């Protein structure tokens, strides 16, 4: 009798063979082991059978982790253990969470924890697709009321062709890195960066990925059917009809009027005032045992009333919350150079959303070293997004970036990264920081706009300005409305969050999260069309202030220069044990990097520091010229002449017969060590030996 009851499915997925199995590892949880190409991921899902008392939100937690042993590596952190989640791991956790969360029933609050662990990797591909497939399969075989399965695909675009699940090497040649996740019938999530692809090309990639992932969904469904786990029966609590009727009849008109208040804080204040009045009017006796439950139910009913009011207004053709029509972008204000001592800065305001964005240029020592399964990554570009509580008029503890901030920062980075110059052309390390100072929707896209402006203000020669816009959707049956430049409320109460960034020529980043099924290609096409019009409108406003990068690097930024030397002279610049280059750095304050080909990159604090470093290096590496007179120092006296140092690390011989016009019997009668003399270079032989003469040269 075998100890394990293993069930597995095998299938070809692009160029990778995929094996999904359960029943052999982590049997006390709903576990799946996914082998995909050279990657193995263990995914375990634990589903609580009951909700915690008083639980009022869905406590779904996804943790993705990469174990260094998976690639045969020992962690470099203190204690040689894996530390807290890296930025990449956090982003993958979000990637798994986003398409899974909408597939649970509304009101379901049982705790679910999903842990995805990369346990083996050949370092040729990312493990995120395998992890998401594993999470979907683990939930499918569990008793959770999960309306899946869901699957994921990565799509590249190489030589004009879509490529399914490209390797890391293939992605280097690809104009697209897109991840799409969905169910059998619907796309739920898209995450991508691109090199200015068209709307049609991006939509084609989404549809291609969704079509290709059907084989994954079929195999997961087949496995779940074979296992046959009975699902938890969840029925949403029945609302008190009298409370719903009372709320709508007494306060429906007031809520509708409140949603004509264009100022966010004033609108929120009015809506809270109406909510408090509704509780007083409808909750009954505050001393009764059921009072707190009634208040909780009334708050849910009130939220539903707000939800229905906003959506009905939009679908009936009424103006949006702030008075706009479906396609109008909020009022824009663009300023650059707002912070005098930063290297580049911009203040981008769109309605009640505002980003203060800075660019800082650093030298090669500022590069971000990232330890990953694939090896150490040298990241020359960073974009950090900060969302303080005051940006929405709230208080709270400030600390390390939360998952949302990391995700928004990565999206903004994707939006501008394709426009950055190659590091060979522009070797600076670049750090962009977006401080969200006001927020009412689409702060990540404001960060894209602000980042583009701050980079240009710093003198970074980006290929083209970039702008971003967030689109929304309200859909009821066959009726739908696509909204341009959504507010925070429209994001919260709508069915789709669709963010698009790009230049005038194409899309550089696209992120989509859909909360409902039934989003058709026609709807996505309409959203992309409106996003294009909105993006061009925003770019026009930005270009009126700063149409292209400044021609010179900001005066406060490090000054950069590159020079070439004879590779044979590299050792002279470095010196014994690095003594010479350390001295150069200490004397000039410049950062100096030398490669094996003799290319020297110099970053000075200012132009003077860079020039000083260049002058010293040129002196060290200078070659003597035959026929040229030099002033040198007598370095050593020998019987047959004297060695004179004419250049740093360069000595030549003045033979005893070349010291004076008359015959010299004793060199020491004419020269002393340390004496300054003028010499003429007579010859340099094929071994590099330098012959000098003092004859006929007037000595001072």
Curated annotation (Swiss-Prot):
Organism superkingdom: Bacteria
Cofactor(s) the protein requires to work: Mg(2+)
Reactions the enzyme catalyzes: RNA(n+1) + phosphate = RNA(n) + a ribonucleoside 5'-diphosphate
A Pfam cross-reference name: S1
Official protein name in the record: Polyribonucleotide nucleotidyltransferase
Cited function: Involved in mRNA degradation. Catalyzes the phosphorolysis of single-stranded polyribonucleotides processively in the 3'- to 5'-direction.
Gene3D superfamilies the record matches: GHMP Kinase, N-terminal domain, K Homology domain, type 1, Nucleic acid-binding proteins
InterPro entries cross-referenced by the UniProt entry: ExoRNase_PH_dom1, ExoRNase_PH_dom2, ExoRNase_PH_dom2_sf, KH_dom, KH_dom_type_1, KH_dom_type_1_sf, NA-bd_OB-fold, PNPase
Keywords: Cytoplasm, Magnesium, Metal-binding, Nucleotidyltransferase, RNA-binding, Transferase
GO molecular function: 3'-5'-RNA exonuclease activity; magnesium ion binding; polyribonucleotide nucleotidyltransferase activity; RNA binding
Protein family per UniProt: Belongs to the polyribonucleotide nucleotidyltransferase family.
Protein's cellular compartments: Cytoplasm
Organismal lineage: Bacteria, Pseudomonadati, Pseudomonadota, Gammaproteobacteria, Moraxellales
NCBIfam families registered for this protein in UniProt: polynuc_phos, PRK11824.1
Quaternary structure (record): Component of the RNA degradosome, which is a multiprotein complex involved in RNA processing and mRNA degradation.
Record-annotated KH domain positions: 558-617
One GO CC term on file: cytosol
PANTHER family: POLYRIBONUCLEOTIDE NUCLEOTIDYLTRANSFERASE, POLYRIBONUCLEOTIDE NUCLEOTIDYLTRANSFERASE 1, MITOCHONDRIAL
């Amino acid at each position: 009798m075998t100890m394990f009851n293993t069930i597995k499915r095998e299938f070809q997925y692009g160029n990778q063979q995929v094996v999904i199995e359960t029943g052999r590892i982590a049997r006390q949880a709903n576990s799946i082991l996914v082998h995909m190409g050279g990657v193995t991921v263990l995914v375990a899902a634990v589903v609580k059978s009951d909700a915690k008392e008083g639980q009022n939100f869905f406590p779904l937690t996804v943790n993705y982790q990469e174990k260094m042993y998976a690639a045969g590596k020992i962690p470099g952190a203190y204690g040689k253990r894996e530390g807290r989640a890296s930025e990449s791991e956090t982003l993958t956790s979000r990637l798994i969470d986003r398409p899974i969360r909408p597939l649970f029933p509304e009101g379901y609050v049982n705790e679910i924890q999903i842990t995805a662990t990369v346990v083996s990797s050949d370092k040729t591909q990312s493990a995120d697709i395998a992890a998401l497939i594993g999470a979907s399969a683990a939930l499918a075989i569990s008793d959770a009321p999960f309306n899946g399965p869901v699957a994921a695909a990565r799509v590249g675009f190489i030589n004009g062709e879509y490529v399914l699940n490209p390797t890391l090497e293939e992605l280097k040649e690809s104009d697209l890195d897109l991840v799409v996740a969905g169910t059998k019938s619907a796309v739920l999530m898209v995450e991508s960066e691109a090199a200015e692809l068209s709307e049609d090309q991006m939509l084609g990639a989404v549809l291609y990925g969704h079509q290709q992932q059907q084989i994954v969904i079929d195999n997961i469904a087949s496995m779940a059917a074979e296992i046959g786990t009975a699902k938890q029966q969840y029925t949403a609590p029945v609302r008190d009809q009298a409370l719903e009727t009372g709320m709508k009849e007494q306060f429906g008109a007031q809520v509708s009027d409140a949603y004509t208040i264009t100022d966010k804080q004033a609108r929120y204040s009015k809506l809270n005032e109406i909510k408090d009045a509704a509780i007083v009017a409808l909750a009954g006796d505050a001393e009764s045992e059921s009072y707190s439950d009634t208040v909780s139910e009334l708050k849910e009913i009130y939220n539903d009333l707000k939800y229905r009011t906003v959506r009905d207004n939009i679908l009936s053709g009424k103006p949006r919350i702030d008075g706009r029509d479906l396609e109008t972008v909020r009022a824009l204000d663009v300023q650059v150079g707002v912070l005098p001592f930063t290297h580049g800065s911009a203040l981008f305001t769109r309605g009640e959303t505002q980003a203060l964005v800075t660019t800082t240029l650093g030298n090669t020592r500022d590069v971000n070293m990232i330890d990953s399964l694939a090896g150490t990554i040298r990241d020359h570009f960073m974009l950090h997004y900060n969302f303080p509580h005051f940006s929405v008029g709230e208080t709270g503890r400030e600390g390390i970036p939360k998952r949302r901030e990391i995700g928004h920062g990565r999206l903004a980075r994707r939006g501008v990264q394709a426009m950055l110059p190659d590091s060979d052309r522009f070797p600076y390390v670049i750090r962009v920081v977006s401080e969200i100072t006001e927020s009412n929707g689409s702060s990540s896209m404001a960060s894209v706009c602000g980042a583009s402006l701050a980079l240009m203000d710093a003198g970074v020669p980006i290929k083209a300005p970039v702008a971003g816009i967030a689109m929304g959707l309200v859909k009821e049956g066959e009726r739908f409305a696509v909204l341009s430049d959504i507010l925070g409320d429209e994001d919260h109460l709508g069915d789709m969050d669709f963010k698009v960034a790009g230049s005038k020529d194409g899309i550089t980043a696209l992120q989509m999260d859909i909360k409902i099924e039934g989003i058709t290609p026609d709807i996505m096409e309409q959203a992309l069309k409106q996003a294009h019009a909105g993006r061009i409108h925003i770019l026009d406003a930005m270009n009126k202030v700063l149409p292209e990068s400044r021609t010179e690097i900001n005066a406060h930024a490090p000054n950069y220069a590159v020079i070439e030397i004879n590779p044979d002279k590299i050792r002279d610049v470095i010196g014994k044990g690095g003594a010479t280059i350390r001295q150069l750095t200490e004397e000039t304050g410049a950062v100096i990097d030398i490669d094996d080909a003799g290319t020297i990159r110099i970053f000075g604090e200012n132009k003077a520091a860079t020039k000083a470093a260049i002058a010293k290096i040129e002196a060290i590496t200078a070659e003597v010229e035959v026929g040229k007179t030099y002033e040198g120092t007598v370095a050593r006296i020998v019987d047959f002449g004297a060695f004179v140092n004419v250049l740093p690390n360069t000595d030549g011989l003045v033979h005893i017969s070349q010291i004076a016009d008359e015959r010299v019997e004793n060199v020491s009668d004419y020269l002393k060590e340390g004496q300054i003399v003028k010499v003429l270079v007579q010859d340099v032989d094929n071994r590099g030996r330098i012959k000098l003469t003092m004859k006929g040269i007037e000595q001072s």
